[in-house]
């Protein structure tokens, strides 16, 4: 007997869970289909375990780089990788349990398996047929790999979280935030780390101040940066080590190589053709601002649409979709402009709005006013490992409306959220000037710039 639902989500990641729970709250009969652990990339091989590892790297840096100058005897003989991984796993298990409890409370049927479209209203899962009035595709994405000889000897970001031990020498290939974060974590935990980027610097899409400062810190503290580095091949040596060969003849031998060159949509195994759902040339599902596909009753949110690939974006889009479909809000949709972003690098980065070059291109040089601040983070200022903290406000027009906020330095990851609200509300430089600073903090620089 075919089972029918009001709403089905294919994919138990951030977007699917958020949307299906919101729909269930409005009395819809819902099902969630997921073949792996709940939580998708973010919880299992992304944001959550990455942040745990970032904290671990911070602790090691505090002990070895900063502790002695604060007067602490920091002689430590051992770092236990297994203990760290066990603690991380236990934390993720608690998140899985939380998801299961909420879905159960909302009477959502969780179906373990892979879904494939039979037609626009019908899915096949584990040999059984189910139908729905509304179907959400939230299958997410997966790491990309280069097409070069020996690519199989490397791992990707998923594989990093399965490492049984910390390698002594690691190469990370990629210039985006995932590559920067992984390289920073591995370097912070004490491995000899190399970061290979195709052009002159990592994070080239960020404001130049961010990229330039990050390169400055990397040159001082690691990881070792290799620019204009285009991989040609990977060779596995007799001792188990790997040699990454570059097109220009350079090479580096390491114990572990991590591909972090980008991600691609995971849409290819659900038989989209049977439903008639359109994808673009890169395989991303084409949606409008309401998350509608070209087929009525089929929607998509998250990384498989090619939108901003961040967990809160998928969550927000999924919830707004359910509000529109099931709570009588016909115009509800996510505004994809001015989405704040944090990179958990060393030091962390926060950014929202337009970069300085983007603002100058959009508004013209004569309409743009930029305010900057550069100082040494207090946390490091009393030590021999001093680290820069740099901030920038990008303003436009006679009223100096703030259209971009950018920073790199200690605490930037936690301070950006509130400033993003201000930018989203249309704050001006005068609004910031009229806000009394909190002292002594790094955040006060944003309201005291001249």
Swiss-Prot record:
Residues noted as binding NADP(+) in the record, renumbered to the chain: 175, 178, 181, 198, 204, 262, 309, 342
Reactions catalysed, as given in the entry: 2 glutathione + NADP(+) = glutathione disulfide + NADPH + H(+)
Recorded effect of pH on activity = Optimum pH is 7.5.
What keywords is this UniProt entry annotated with? Answer: Cytoplasm, Disulfide bond, FAD, Flavoprotein, NADP, Oxidoreductase, Redox-active center
Similarity remark? Belongs to the class-I pyridine nucleotide-disulfide oxidoreductase family.
Further facts: The active site is a redox-active disulfide bond.
Name of the protein this chain belongs to: Glutathione reductase
- In the UniProt record, what gene is named as encoding this protein? gor
């Amino acid at each position: 007997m075919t089972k029918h639902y009001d709403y089905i989500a294919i994919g138990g990641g951030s977007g699917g869970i958020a949307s299906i729970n919101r729909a269930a709250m409005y009395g819809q009969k819902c099902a969630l289909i997921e073949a792996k652990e709940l939580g998708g990339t973010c919880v299992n091989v992304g944001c959550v375990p990455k942040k745990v590892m970032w904290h671990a790297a911070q602790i090691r840096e505090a002990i070895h780089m900063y502790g002695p100058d604060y007067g602490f005897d920091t002689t430590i003989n051992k770092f236990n990788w297994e203990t760290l991984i066990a603690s991380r796993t236990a934390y993720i298990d608690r998140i899985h349990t939380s998801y299961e409890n909420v879905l159960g409370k909302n009477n959502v049927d969780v179906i373990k398996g892979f879904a494939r479209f039979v037609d626009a209203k019908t899915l096949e899962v584990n040999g059984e047929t189910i139908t729905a009035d509304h179907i959400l595709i939230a299958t997410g994405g997966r790491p990309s790999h280069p097409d070069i000889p020996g690519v199989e000897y490397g791992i990707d970001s998923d594989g990093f979280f399965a490492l049984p031990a910390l390698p002594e020498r690691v190469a990370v290939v990629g210039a985006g935030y995932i590559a920067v974060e992984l390289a920073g974590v591995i370097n912070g935990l004490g491995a000899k780390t190399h970061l290979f980027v195709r052009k002159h610097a990592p994070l080239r899409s960020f404001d130049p101040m961010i990229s330039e400062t990050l390169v400055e810190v990397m040159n001082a503290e690691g990881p070792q940066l290799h620019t204009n580095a285009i991989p040609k091949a990977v060779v596995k040596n007799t001792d188990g080590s790997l040699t990454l060969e570059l097109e220009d003849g350079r090479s580096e031998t390491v114990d572990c190589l991590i591909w972090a060159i980008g991600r691609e949509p995971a849409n290819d195994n659900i038989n989209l053709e049977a439903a008639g759902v359109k994808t673009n040339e890169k395989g991303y599902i084409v949606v409008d601002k309401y998350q509608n596909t070209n087929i009525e009753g089929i929607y998509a949110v998250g990384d498989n649409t090619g939108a901003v690939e961040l967990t809160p974006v998928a969550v927000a889009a999924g919830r707004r979709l359910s509000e529109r479909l099931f709570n009588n809000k016909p115009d509800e949709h996510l505004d994809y402009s001015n989405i704040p972003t944090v990179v958990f690098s060393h030091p962390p980065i926060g950014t929202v709005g337009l970069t300085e070059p983007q603002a100058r291109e959009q508004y013209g040089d004569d309409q743009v006013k930029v305010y900057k601040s550069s100082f040494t983070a207090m946390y490091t200022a009393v030590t021999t490992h001093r680290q820069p903290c740099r901030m920038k406000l990008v303003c436009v027009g006679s009223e100096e409306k703030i259209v971009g906020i950018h920073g790199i330095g200690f605490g930037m990851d936690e301070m950006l959220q509130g400033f993003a609200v201000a930018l989203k509300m249309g704050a001006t430089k005068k609004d910031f000037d009229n806000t009394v600073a909190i002292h002594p903090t790094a955040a006060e620089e944003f309201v005291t710039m001249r």
